[in-house]
């Protein structure tokens, strides 16, 4: 079994995404594809992100989660929920300002039997770089702390594109 997976369920425009294991850069194309398909669904109202079984999450993934949260708020006016039961992950999402775009819940969801695993998509190095750049620009747009934290990374990635 892989050390990571993304599970999904949907009912009446409410999506549930559960992240299991180490959610890192290797899943950015899979996650971005999922975010795009969800946000293009005309019935999409909101999303519940479950990180209760997430061991590691990187800033690229956080940027893509911010993207879907902002889309939910724009499309329906509903603030999405994020479940985080691990203190380290809760601290990271708090430091990124996620409490301004998510309702943060510290209790795990009890029933997840309807979730289906999302297959991992392979991506080229350029596609991964593009997703990393987009995700970090989203994080930078959330607050000044994130802007300061990621400006050098974004600058370096933009220089690689033009170089």
Which residues fall in each region the model found?
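STAS-like cytosolic regulatory interaction modules
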Residues: 1-53, 71-163
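Residues immediately C-terminal
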Residues: 56
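Histidine-anchored nucleotide/phosphate-binding helix
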Residues: 65-69
């Amino acid at each position: 079994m892989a050390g990571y997976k993304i599970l999904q369920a949907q009912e009446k425009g409410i999506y549930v995404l559960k992240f299991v294991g180490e959610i890192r850069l290797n899943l950015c194309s899979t996650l971005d594809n999922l975010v795009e398909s969800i946000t293009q669904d005309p019935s999409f109202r909101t999303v519940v992100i479950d990180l209760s079984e997430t061991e590691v999450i990187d800033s690229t993934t956080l940027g893509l989660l911010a993207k879907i949260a902002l889309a939910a708020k724009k499309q329906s006016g509903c603030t999405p929920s994020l479940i985080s039961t691990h203190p380290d992950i809760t601290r990271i999402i708090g430091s990124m300002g996620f409490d301004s775009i998510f309702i943060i819940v510290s209790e795990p969801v009890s029933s997840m039997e309807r979730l289906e695993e999302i297959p991992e998509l392979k991506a080229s190095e350029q596609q991964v770089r593009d997703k990393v750049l987009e995700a970090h620009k989203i994080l930078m747009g959330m607050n000044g702390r994130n802007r300061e934290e990621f400006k050098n990374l974004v600058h370096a990635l933009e220089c690689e594109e033009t170089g």
